Amino acid sequence: MVGKSVVTLDGLSTNQILDLLHKAEYIDSHRKEIAHTCDGRVLATLFYEPSTRTRLSFETAMLRLGGKVIGFAGAQLASVTKGESIADTLKTVSNYVDVVTIRHPKEGAALVASRAASVPVINAGDGGHMHPTQTLADLATLQSRFGRITDLTVGLCGDLTFGRTVHSLIETLCRFGNVRFVLISPDELKTPQYVIDRINATDSCSYVEVRDLASVIGDLDVLYMTRVQKERFFNEDDYLRLRDTYILDEEKLQLAKPSMAVLHPLPRVNEIAVDVDDDPRAAYFEQVKNGMLVRMALESTVVGDELPGYEPLNPKEVQA
């Protein structure tokens, strides 16, 4: 993985993904020991779209590893306003840093960036396409809650059309297999066909599509809530009509298993009531912490800096 870009998780083997999760656990329990792992390294955060958690998470990850951070938050602060291409920006920034993370509203922008850069590029979300590091955070949370990331019934609820975190998670869970997906959405926000095709191509995975959350919540091990994304709509009336379709509150949670985990990539609007936050099934703020840890694992890995005392799960496989 050293020197490699991470645009999607498809470029990583399942063992490499598991090792990143294992490495994140190690980092969490060895904060002081790993604090100088990336001394002298510089991360560039190129965020052409607004972000709070993801950008701060990437930046904090590098700072906690001993490195430094440069970058911008908002396309209006970049030379794109002067007409500069993504490729030219990446060719330039590559001369300054050891690793780049990019968020962009256009699908495929991260791939363009990775091809232009001379240093590793990590995709922090490209339009409605993929969000690989959020998926790593999701997997780390499932691993922490259940001790596994297979043999689960996973409900995904809300905006399944534009939700890049949903697409990334489904595709990655299919690689590990033995997952039943329950896709909960209005007809206007159904899962894209290419994601459905991915499920169908996996013998050990299956799916159902439903509109009513209450009718299926009792069957779920995991409920992955998403917001309806206003920024993806061209018509505000459509957004307002669909925004309140699914709201998870304590009343609905009474129908769920005591062991169910509620995940959300954040930010939320109103799709999870605040009173759910104190329920032990609420795992979305754990995801935030896990997101920073997996980004620490990924950043240190792609620049080739070894964590002191860490032993990989399978050295030959994960170093490929």
Describe every region a protein language model picked out.
Residues 119, 177-179, 255-261:
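A short helix->loop->beta-strand "cap" motif at the edges of active sites that frequently abuts
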Residues 199-276, 281-282:
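Rossmann-like adenosine-cofactor binding region
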Residues 1-56, 60:
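Positively charged, low-complexity intrinsically disordered leader regions
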Residues 48-61, 144-225:
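Glycine-rich phosphate/diphosphate-binding loop of Rossmann-like nucleotide-binding domains
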Residues 36-143, 270-272:
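Phosphate/diphosphate ligand-binding glycine-rich loop within oxidoreductases
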Residues 37-43, 150-154, 178, 259:
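Phosphate-coordination loops involved in phosphoryl transfer and adenosine-cofactor binding
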Residues 259-260, 265-320:
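Adenosine-phosphate binding glycine-rich loop
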